[in-house]
Regions:
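Acidic/polar active-site rim loop that often engages polyanionic ligands
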Residues: 36-40, 85-86, 128-137, 178-182
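Generic enzyme active-site microenvironment
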Residues: 79
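GST superfamily/GST-like fold recognition
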Residues: 1-21, 110, 125, 135-200
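Active-site-adjacent loop/tail segments of enzyme domains
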Residues: 82-113
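N-terminal polybasic phosphate/anion-binding patch
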Residues: 1-76, 149, 153-157, 195-198
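Conserved anionic group-binding/transfer micro-motifs
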Residues: 56, 100, 189
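Anionic-ligand binding region
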Residues: 101-105, 116-139
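Short beta-strand scaffold segments in enzyme catalytic cores
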Residues: 82-85, 114-123, 167
């Protein structure tokens, strides 16, 4: 069974490869801001867990019907999204070095929560059969003794501040951030069915 990764995230691709999975990468092209805005208008403010689960689902669903390598998708689609929550504020990925630096300075000496949402869809002959979503949470503690120069080194390496994306040669991250997983909450359509699908 093939796994289709609905993401161009280097971190997610690296994590899958670390456990021996070589997925088919299919970009999803979801307008995340518009999707969150629409959901908020319809259902009220989303918390971080609901937001990453929603975006993970939309990314997975966005590639249904696509034909990577000229063939219908047949296997399992994986969509993912993550967000960092600190002091009641939710942060997405910083797309500019200056924003990344400002966030490091703000987060120094504080503890926040990283929310990671995933959504998988079993696809047979190009049609969705079953789906399952879950959100994991990790407590992220930023040490107070990290220097401005170490933060600058981290930003200069352009390391994506996302769980699983840690460059070994950037001590600003590996030495000054303590990540403690705190379990996962599931948003499921059919747990048993999806587990069976991924085991086939």
């Amino acid at each position: 069974m093939r796994l289709y990764l609905a993401s161009t995230s280097p971190a997610r691709l690296a994590l899958l490869r670390q456990v021996g999975i070589e997925p088919v990468v299919v970009p999803s092209h979801v307008d995340e801001e518009a999707a969150v805005r629409l959901a908020t208008d319809s259902n009220g403010e989303l918390d971080a867990s609901a937001m990453v689960t929603l975006l993970a689902r939309l990314k997975a669903e966005a590639i249904l019907g696509q034909r990577p390598d000229g063939e219908e998708i047949d296997g399992v689609i994986l969509g993912g999204d993550s967000a960092f929550e600190l002091g009641g504020d939710i942060y997405g990925k910083p797309h500019e070095p200056q924003i990344a630096r400002e966030r490091w300075l703000e987060q120094r000496g504080k503890t926040g929560t990283l929310h990671s949402g995933h959504w998988i869809i079993e696809v047979k002959n190009g049609q969705a059969a079953r789906a399952l979503g879950a959100t994991a949470h990790a407590s992220v503690e930023f040490a107070s003794d990290i220097s401005d120069s170490e933060i600058d080194a981290y930003v200069a390496e352009r390391v994506e501040p996302e769980f699983g994306r840690v460059e070994r040669d950037v001590p600003a991250f590996s030495c000054h951030v303590n990540i403690q997983p705190s379990g996962a909450s599931a948003h499921s359509i059919d747990h048993a069915a999806c587990q069976a699908a991924t085991a086939e």
